[in-house]
From Swiss-Prot:
Its main location: secreted. The lineage of its organism: Eukaryota, Metazoa, Ecdysozoa, Arthropoda, Chelicerata. Gene3D superfamilies: Knottin, scorpion toxin-like. It comes from the Eukaryota. Disulfide bonds join 26-46, 32-51, 36-53. It comes from Scorpiops pococki (Scorpion). PROSITE patterns: SCORP_SHORT_TOXIN. This is Potassium channel toxin alpha-KTX 12 Sp2.
């Protein structure tokens, strides 16, 4: 039981930390709210309410 709780916590932490790497949330005007640095890309494209990076 304890292992399941630890795995759940780790997954939550990874998702929370990992989400900004894949791009910030998009603004109401469908623009990225912050520059994209993941994968060497400096620009982002909004997809499903999230910013996707491209070089």
């Amino acid at each position: 039981m304890r292992l399941a709780i630890i795995l759940l916590l780790m997954t939550t932490i990874v998702l929370t930390i990992g989400s900004p790497l894949h791009g910030a949330k998009c603004s109401s005007s469908n623009q990225c709210t912050r520059p994209c640095r993941y994968g060497g890309g400096t620009h982002g494209k909004c997809m499903n309410g999230r910013c996707r990076c491209y070089g």
